[in-house]
Curated annotation (Swiss-Prot):
Encoding gene per record: PDGFD
Tissue: Expressed at high levels in the heart, pancreas, adrenal gland and ovary and at low levels in placenta, liver, kidney, prostate, testis, small intestine, spleen and colon. In the kidney, expressed by the visceral epithelial cells of the glomeruli. A widespread expression is also seen in the medial smooth muscle cells of arteries and arterioles, as well as in smooth muscle cells of vasa rectae in the medullary area. Expressed in the adventitial connective tissue surrounding the suprarenal artery.
Signal peptide annotation: 1-18
Family the UniProt entry places it in: Belongs to the PDGF/VEGF growth factor family.
Protein name: Platelet-derived growth factor D
Residues carrying the site annotation Cleavage: 247-250
Keywords on record: Cleavage on pair of basic residues, Developmental protein, Disulfide bond, Glycoprotein, Growth factor, Mitogen, Proto-oncogene, Secreted, Signal
Molecular functions per Gene Ontology: growth factor activity; platelet-derived growth factor receptor binding
Gene Ontology CC: one annotated term: extracellular region
Subunit structure, as described in the record: Homodimer; disulfide-linked. Interacts with PDGFRB homodimers, and with heterodimers formed by PDGFRA and PDGFRB.
Disulfide linkage: 109-131, 302-360, 306-362
Length: 370
């Protein structure tokens, strides 16, 4: 096994992010790769995981791609591109039609994959993870002015051509128009190079809208009627067919049908409910000059969430709908009264009152969150 200096021209051509002169990288220059010492095997593949994180200020058009695109990419890579644009702008990503990574295992991209994440100050949303050769990933529009692209390859199989992602700046910062739900061919130009990509609806946005719609239904029958008014009964019967297509992993040898309506009702009924909660008595009563035994007691307090019980669940919180005070007998001790002239420390069994929540309600804001 030899330890060689990793030649600049090899990686500079392979680990690529190309942009026009207005898109400026903020990370260290790629020339720093001249001094990277990496082990190689006899097949000229990297044997140590190579990591690189690059930040790109998006002011125009450009692209990032897997090393050696459109040829086979190296093994053991973990490459990250963080794309930033000005406030009140968004970033659009379009995959080149030449796309191919190592195939998925059981429909899960475990080994080699490219992943896109939406980044905001409060959350990170995975827009998708792709591998294999079956289809080109859809066009993606960031929800904020930041988006992250990650490419990972393991130390086994590789594939070609890899991937190439064109990025561009969107200054409209408006919700996607209804016309963008149509399938059409979009041709753009970057530095004189044209590319074609299908214009498809962002699957994340479709799923969000569908999830909000599903929250309106309480039974499987109502849900299927909404999707297929003419054939919902047939769909309902087919759902429980004893075939691998309809049999879930939790089926095993169960003879009865799963009661989806009951599961849905349980989630709504018991997500926001009173439950055991341990409270510190001194903190609960706001008493600093006494101590108690036991120090803590169990009370019933509202807990859980309203995620599956309401339509606009992000604006809802689980709060007490009915609160009662209950007595508890505890041992109270006043540490300031120490033993003096035969007088014992002050200790006594006392009754204290603690709040218990008997009913919990989901309180929702009149305005859904942005």
């Amino acid at each position: 096994m030899h330890r060689l200096i990793f030649v600049y021209t090899l990686i500079c051509a392979n680990f690529c992010s190309c942009r026009d002169t207005s898109a400026t990288p903020q990370s260290a220059s790629i020339k720093a790769l001249r001094n990277a010492n990496l082990r190689r095997d006899e097949s000229n593949h990297l044997t140590d995981l190579y990591r690189r994180d690059e930040t790109i200020q998006v002011k125009g058009n450009g692209y990032v791609q897997s090393p050696r695109f459109p040829n086979s990419y190296p093994r053991n890579l973990l490459l990250t591109w963080r794309l930033h644009s000005q406030e009140n702008t968004r970033i659009q990503l379009v995959f080149d039609n030449q796309f191919g990574l190592e195939e998925a295992e059981n429909d899960i991209c475990r080994y080699d994959f490219v992943e896109v994440e939406d980044i905001s100050e409060t959350s990170t949303i995975i827009r998708g993870r792709w591998c294999g050769h079956k289809e080109v990933p859809p066009r993606i529009k960031s929800r904020t002015n930041q988006i992250k692209i990650t490419f990972k390859s393991d130390d086994y199989f590789v594939a070609k051509p890899g991937f190439k992602i064109y990025y561009s700046l969107l200054e409209d910062f408006q919700p996607a128009a209804a016309s963008e739900t149509n399938w059409e061919s979009v041709t753009s130009s970057i530095s004189g190079v044209s590319y074609n990509s299908p214009s498809v609806t962002d699957p994340t946005l479709i799923a969000d809208a569908l999830d909000k719609k599903i929250a309106e239904f309480d039974t499987v029958e109502d849900l299927l009627k909404y999707f297929n008014p003419e054939s919902w009964q047939e769909d309902l019967e087919n759902m429980y067919l004893d075939t691998p297509r309809y049999r879930g992993r939790s089926y095993h040898d169960r003879k009865s049908k799963v009661d989806l309506d009951r599961l849905n009702d349980d989630a709504k009924r018991y997500s926001c409910t009173p439950r055991n909660y341990s409270v510190n008595i001194r903190e609960e009563l706001k008493l600093a000059n006494v101590v108690f035994f036991p120090r803590c007691l169990l009370v019933q307090r509202c807990g859980g969430n309203c995620g599956c019980g309401t339509v606009n669940w992000r604006s809802c919180t689980c709060n007490s709908g009915k609160t009662v005070k209950k007595y508890h007998e505890v041992l109270q001790f006043e540490p300031g009264h120490i033993k003096r002239r035969g007088r014992a420390k002050t200790m006594a069994l006392v009754d204290i009152q603690l709040d218990h929540h008997e009913r919990c309600d989901c309180i929702c804001s009149s305005r859904p969150p942005r």
